[in-house]
Amino acid sequence: MRPAQLLLNTAKKTSGGYKIPVELTPLFLAVGVALCSGTYFTYKKLRTDETLRLTGNPELSSLDEVLAKDKD
């Protein structure tokens, strides 16, 4: 039984820095997919939605009307 114990001890030694349990791999995968899809859909919403006023949008701006009333 002694040689088997020696083989187990050598197999347990790893040269890597982090020891991540195998059970956490699906969790990391799910979080990665959620982050990627959240980033994609947020970017898509901000890029294509014309009702958001992120940039100067003169069609939806009532600033000119307010300034014109102020001058009168």
Swiss-Prot record:
GO cellular component, one term: cytosol
Domain of life of the native organism: Eukaryota
Cellular location(s): Cytoplasm; Membrane
Keyword match Transmembrane helix: yes
InterPro entries in the record: B12D
GO biological process: negative regulation of protein-containing complex assembly
Membrane topology: Single-pass membrane protein
Keyword tags: Cytoplasm, Membrane, Transmembrane, Transmembrane helix
Leader sequence segment: none
Transmembrane segments annotated in the record for this chain: 20-42
Keyword Protein transport among UniProt keywords: no
Family, similarity comment: Belongs to the UPF0495 family.
Protein name: UPF0495 protein YPR010C-A
Organism ancestry: Eukaryota, Fungi, Dikarya, Ascomycota, Saccharomycotina
